[in-house]
C-alpha cells in the first residue's frame, strides 16, 4: 500500500435511493438525466439485505431518498428493518404523498427524522418550480403534522436565481412553521441542475445579499431566543478553493441507486468508471476492494497542482464529478480551484450568470418524457 494512501474506514452514512419515481418536476433535481432508463428497483428483501450488510460494516445513519421515497409502499417495512438493525433513520421527502396516517405508521416503525423540501416561500413560484399547483399547501400541512408528532422540524429550500431574493420570506415561513433546522442550500450543479445551470446559478450580488439576510436573521433570532438553526450553503462556483466533496472519495458516504448500483456519491454514476452492483458483490467487497471505490481514494491519483498542494488533505482535490462535467476528465483538478488550469470554466459560468435572462418557464424540467428524449437524442 502506498504511504500516501490512508487506511479505509467503514461507510458511516448510507443513502438508499429507493426509487427515481417522483410526482414533482424540479429543474434542479440531482437525479441522473437518463433516470427514465432505470426501470428496475430493488425488492424489499434486497434493500433489507443491503441495510444488514452496511450495519455490519459499521454504518450508523441511513437516509431514505429518491425520487420520492413515499412512492414505495414498503417504506414502513424498510424503516422498521433499519430501526431494528440499529440505524438512525432519516426520510428525505417532498411531502407529496405524505399523510397523517403514514406519519403515524412511520413513527410506529421507528423513523427518527423527517426532512421536507420546499421550492419557494409562496404558492405561485413553488408551483412553477415543482410542476404541481397543489404542492405548496400539501407541504405546509405535512410540515405542521410532522411538528405535531414531535419529530425534529427540518426544512430544506434549494436556492437559485429565481427564489434567492425572497430569502427573507423563506426564513419567515420557517419561523412560522417552528422549524428546528433549516437548510438553505444553494443549488449544487449536478444532474438536472447542471443542465439548467445558466438559468439557475445566482449572481455574485445575489449571493452577497443572501449572506447578509441570513446573518441579520441569525442575529435577530438569537436576540429573541429563537433557537432555529439556519444552515446556508453557498455554491462553490463563487469560491476559489473546492469543497472537500463527501469528506473524501469512498471515505464516509455510500449511496445505492434504485436498481442496486453502489456509488461513492450520488452523482458518480455519470463517470466513465464501472461501479458494482449490490446484487453481484457484497457491500464489504464493494467498499474495500472494488476499482470504482478505490479509483480516487487517497492522494496517489492526483495530478499537479493537486499532488504537491498543501491543501490536499482538506479538499481531497475537490469534486471528481464536477471535474468530469466541466473538463471531460474526472482526473483533472476541480475547476473551482483558482490553481486549476481549468478555472476559466468557472469564470465563464459566472459571466453567464451575470447576464442570464432565462425565466422559470424556460428551464428544462425533470420528468420522464424529457429524460427519455435526452437519452434518445444522445444515442443518435
Curated annotation (Swiss-Prot):
One of its GO terms (biological process) is pyrroloquinoline quinone biosynthetic process. Binds 1 [4Fe-4S] cluster. The cluster is coordinated with 3 cysteines and an exchangeable S-adenosyl-L-methionine. InterPro entries: 4Fe4S-binding_SPASM_dom (IPR023885), Aldolase_TIM (IPR013785), Elp3/MiaA/NifB-like_rSAM (IPR006638), MoaA_NifB_PqqE_Fe-S-bd_CS (IPR000385), PQQ_synth_PqqE_bac (IPR011843), PqqE-like (IPR017200), Radical_SAM_PqqE_MftC-like (IPR050377), rSAM (IPR007197). Pfam families: Fer4_12, Radical_SAM, SPASM. It is an enzyme of class 1 (oxidoreductase). It catalyses: [PQQ precursor protein] + S-adenosyl-L-methionine = E-Y cross-linked-[PQQ precursor protein] + 5'-deoxyadenosine + L-methionine + H(+). Interacts with PqqD. The interaction is necessary for activity of PqqE. This is PqqA peptide cyclase. It comes from Klebsiella pneumoniae (strain 342). The gene is pqqE.
